[in-house]
């Protein structure tokens, strides 16, 4: 992993295109916590590169961070329902602020789309760091579940 002190200058945040789908899915498949296979993505969630490319033309958008041309992490959201669908960071870049950056980009977009409240589903297992990460950023559990995942919500900050 690059040193976190020198990585900030090398990080490039940009909006995803359909051409980025294979590299971002490779990042999602590389994660150790909440691991998943391509077959599980397709069979359990109906997620394919073709389907995502189609949805990116209408209601799905995503942002990624690159470091030296390599996809380090990404996040995607759904404007039709205010959901942050995924946040994933390659293990080589964990702890470098990548997840926070891509999540902020998606949240900003969803709020700009008119959602006063956005949501995501996270594994409630306390051994998985995701829920703590989200709570540290202001997300709150609401007690609802989506399958085996717990729903967390973020309310749009009031203008100052």
Regions found by a protein language model. Give the residues of each.
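Acetyl-CoA-dependent GNAT
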Residues: 15-86, 90-92, 103-105, 109, ...
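Conserved beta-strand-loop-alpha-helix junction that forms the acyl-donor binding cleft
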Residues: 120-131, 146-151
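Active-site beta-strand termini and strand-to-loop segments that position acidic
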Residues: 66-68, 154-158
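Conserved acetyl-CoA-binding loop of GNAT-fold acetyltransferases
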Residues: 134-144
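Conserved GNAT acetyl-CoA-binding A-motif
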Residues: 110-123
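Active-site acidic-Proline motif in GNAT/NAT acetyltransferases
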Residues: 90-96, 124-126
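Conserved N-terminal entry element of GNAT/NAT acetyltransferase domains
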Residues: 1-19, 158-160
């Amino acid at each position: 992993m690059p040193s976190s002190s020198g990585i900030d200058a090398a990080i490039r945040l940009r909006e995803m295109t359909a051409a980025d789908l294979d590299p971002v899915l490779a990042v999602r498949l590389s994660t150790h916590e909440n691991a998943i296979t391509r077959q599980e993505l397709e069979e359990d969630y109906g997620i394919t590169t073709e389907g995502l490319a189609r949805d990116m033309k209408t209601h799905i958008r995503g942002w990624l961070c690159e470091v030296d041309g390599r996809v380090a992490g990404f996040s995607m959201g759904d404007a039709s329902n205010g959901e942050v669908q995924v946040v994933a960071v390659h293990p080589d870049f964990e702890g470098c602020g990548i997840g926070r950056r891509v999540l902020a980009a998606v949240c900003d977009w969803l709020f700009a789309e008119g959602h006063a409240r956005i949501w995501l589903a996270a594994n409630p297992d306390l051994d998985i760091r995701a829920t703590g990460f989200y709570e540290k950023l202001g997300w709150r559990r609401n007690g609802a579940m989506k399958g085996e995942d717990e729903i967390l919500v973020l309310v749009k900050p009031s203008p100052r």
